[in-house]
């Protein structure tokens, strides 16, 4: 990967070296540095996508099917540990979105993971997912639920309704708990309600894109999974 540079052989390490006469103003990333790093990211993602395409193919044997599931579990683990916790990641996650499109079980597992992280996360011993870090992780997971369901064309109407039902059930439980606390409840807008607001925003976002699928009896026009198991 160190050889991935632009056509002129310019490497990111060149842009990181301010050279003689540098000033404090040059501490901020220059546009050419960003362009080089973006080019490398594109090249890495392209190489990864081509590798995964060669690996998955159309399953013609049990070994190939097993390999596909193993790769998906690896990607899902990397997404949960790294991408989900990365602030404003805007590109790398689309490798995960693409792989999830290959099989309806992958899409279900991905959504299940996101819903679990956002709605039902329970801190466990020996992890750092406590307090504010756990809240941030849950907010990020809710945001991914919204963008994934709203924009993934292969997510059908029934799945969309299932996701929104889970989100609304969580919101309803939060409102009941808030009412039960009475005067001791944190005021609206307090940090304690951050996850509730994130989930509410997710519902509104999904509604804006998929409101037709939320109607009773709606039939989705989502395309079938191109590489689904036969």
Label each residue range with its predicted role.
Residues 1-81:
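Alpha-helical repeat/alpha-solenoid scaffolds of the HEAT/ARM/MIF4G superfamily
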Residues 84-85, 133:
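Solvent-exposed loop and edge beta-strand segments that line ligand/cofactor-binding
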Residues 88-91:
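Generic helix N-cap/helix-start motif at coil->alpha-helix transitions
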Residues 93-230:
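Eukaryotic scaffolding regions of large macromolecular assemblies
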